[in-house]
Amino acid sequence: MGQKVHPIGFRLGVIRSWDSKWYEEKNYAKWLHEDIKLREFVKEKLGQAGISRIEIERAANKVKINVHTARPGIVIGKRGAGIETIKKDLQGLTDNEVYLNVVEVRKAETDAQLVAENIATQLERRIAFRRAMKKSVQTALKFGAKGIRVACSGRLGGSEMARYEWYREGRVPLHTLRADIDYGFAEAKTTYGKIGCKVWIMRGEVLPQSAAARAPRTTGGARP
């Protein structure tokens, strides 16, 4: 039986980069667990800020955390007070000097993680799952997505038996490496159990840099 590989992991090193950018031999395990703690803390502290992804860069004794958010105002706070508080709390989780950078997500409607979280929030508010899914599909296409697939699984609508439902519009080629496919997952915690929400968004095609460099340049004129 065929299984679906993670679309982001499948494209790492081809058209997508890693979310943790550092190299270490001796302290690898320590830094890895540190990264997990830092990410969990930021997501917990800024749950309402619409966090898309968190990038962590390390160099010497410094840690740079790039928070991609749809609502940068919530993260920064009044006159930057919010960002300073979070930075101080993050400093307690690591021995290295912390730098916090906020990156605004311009189109939240075409960000898979934010779309998945939006669907999960609607399900928690008892909005009909089909309505929430269809609305997300239409909105993503309206804002320039080439294709989108949305799937929900669990006790949908409070039914006794769990099931899996999905909708797709446009192109979502999961095995085309040059296809820029974003993937997001969120869980809706409802009174009748958890419902998993998965979103795949095709944002277009990207030619890998290495392939672009190898491609021969075409010039006018006949061959010698």
UniProtKB/Swiss-Prot annotation:
GO terms for cellular component: cytosolic small ribosomal subunit. SMART domains: KH (SM00322). CDD domains: KH-II_30S_S3 (cd02412). One of its GO terms (molecular function) is structural constituent of ribosome. InterPro entries: KH_dom, KH_dom-like_a/b, KH_dom_type_2, KH_sf_prok-type, Ribosomal_S3_C_sf, Ribosomal_uS3_bac-typ, Ribosomal_uS3_C, Ribosomal_uS3_CS. GO terms for biological process: translation. Keywords: Ribonucleoprotein, Ribosomal protein, RNA-binding, rRNA-binding. It holds the Pfam family Ribosomal_S3_C. Residues 38-106 form the KH type-2 domain. Binds the lower part of the 30S subunit head. Binds mRNA in the 70S ribosome, positioning it for translation. Part of the 30S ribosomal subunit. Forms a tight complex with proteins S10 and S14. Belongs to the universal ribosomal protein uS3 family. This is Small ribosomal subunit protein uS3.
